Curated annotation (Swiss-Prot):
Enzyme class: lyase
GO biological process, one term: menaquinone biosynthetic process
InterPro entries documented for this protein: AB_hydrolase_1, AB_hydrolase_fold, SHCHC_synthase_MenH
UniProt-recorded name of the protein: 2-succinyl-6-hydroxy-2,4-cyclohexadiene-1-carboxylate synthase
Catalysed reaction equations from the record: 5-enolpyruvoyl-6-hydroxy-2-succinyl-cyclohex-3-ene-1-carboxylate = (1R,6R)-6-hydroxy-2-succinyl-cyclohexa-2,4-diene-1-carboxylate + pyruvate
Keywords of this entry: Lyase, Menaquinone biosynthesis
Family to which this protein belongs: Belongs to the AB hydrolase superfamily. MenH family.
Organism expressing this protein natively: Yersinia pestis
Taxonomy, superkingdom: Bacteria
A GO MF term: 2-succinyl-6-hydroxy-2,4-cyclohexadiene-1-carboxylate synthase activity
Gene this chain is encoded by: menH
EC number(s) recorded for this UniProt protein: 4.2.99.20
Subunit structure: Monomer.
Job description of the protein: Catalyzes a proton abstraction reaction that results in 2,5-elimination of pyruvate from 2-succinyl-5-enolpyruvyl-6-hydroxy-3-cyclohexene-1-carboxylate (SEPHCHC) and the formation of 2-succinyl-6-hydroxy-2,4-cyclohexadiene-1-carboxylate (SHCHC).
């Protein structure tokens, strides 16, 4: 059994859930991140217990690898089982969002209560687009393996999806992500390329648990995607592609509102 590194956060002592087992919030980070990225939001959602997961090749799971989406979904299921988590809400950002959608649609998730996706791509609709993306991701992976990481990251954060970042914010992210292990990032990037990802929209539309799509109001690419495919969209003010980092308070409020609407959580916890 392969289990991913993770950190548990107990509910607030005053939470009605503190003494009673209930659904967990399980958080999946993006490429180059770690479970710690979710800590500010998870703490603001403190009426729920949280599990902050390090995906393969990242954080404390840096030595773990994955053979595609099905394998990562299996590792996630085994991690939840090992931690005694039977009921959970799954939240994921960017790469973590894509993994979360795949897991919800195709994985073993008998206790899944709902799905929250931030800026996750649904996939590419035809083989030509998938092949082009696979080639692009292989080029990035080669750079992550061979070049100094700060140099690669400086170019990585120049991509159009990060256009909302100013130079200082880019510099901060390069410094923050420079402690990654380039070859491990490369392996994960190739294993989870959009070129390997199935087109998830049809399965998502058949999903039998509630789901929502969160997006920064400056993240034009994923705003357009959500609107094009009529996803249940909620936007975050003053935020780009990484909305939970830019505006954790607003993000946590959206999470709690969704959970309240979907599971009849008492309104008092929304104002905390």
């Amino acid at each position: 059994m392969t289990t991913l590194a993770c950190r548990k956060l107990a509910p607030h002592p005053e939470s009605p859930r503190h003494q009673h087992a209930g659904p967990w919030l399980v958080w999946l980070h993006g490429l180059l991140g770690s479970g710690q990225d979710w800590l500010p939001v998870a703490q603001l959602c403190g009426d729920y217990p949280s599990l902050l997961i390090d995906l393969p090749g990242h954080g404390q799971s840096v030595s773990l690898s994955a053979d595609g989406f099905a394998d990562i979904s299996r590792q996630l299921s085994q991690t939840l089982q090992a931690n005694g988590i039977r009921e959970y809400w799954l939240a994921g950002y960017s790469l973590g969002g894509r993994i979360a959608i795949y897991h919800a649609c195709y994985g073993r998730h008998h206790g899944l209560q709902g799905l929250l996706v931030e800026g996750g791509n649904l996939g590419l609709e035809n083989a030509e687009l998938r092949q082009a993306r696979l080639q692009q991701d292989r080029q990035w992976a080669q750079r992550f393996r061979q070049e100094p990481l700060p140099q690669v990251l400086d170019d990585w954060y120049q991509q159009a999806v990060f256009a909302d970042l100013d130079p200082q914010q880019r510099e901060q992210l390069v410094l923050l992500r420079a402690d990654n292990h380039g070859p491990a990032v490369a392996e994960m990037l190739e294993a989870t390329s959009l070129g390997h990802q199935p087109w998830l929209l049809p399965a998502l539309q058949r999903l039998n648990v509630p789901y929502t799509y969160l997006c920064g109001d400056r993240d034009h690419k994923f705003l357009q995607l959500a609107q094009q495919y009529r996803l249940p969209l909620h936007t975050l003010a003053r935020a780009g592609h990484n909305a939970h980092r830019a505006n954790p308070g607003a993000f946590a409020a959206q999470v709690l509102a969704f959970l309240s609407q979907s599971s009849c959580l008492p309104p008092s916890s929304l104002s905390r």
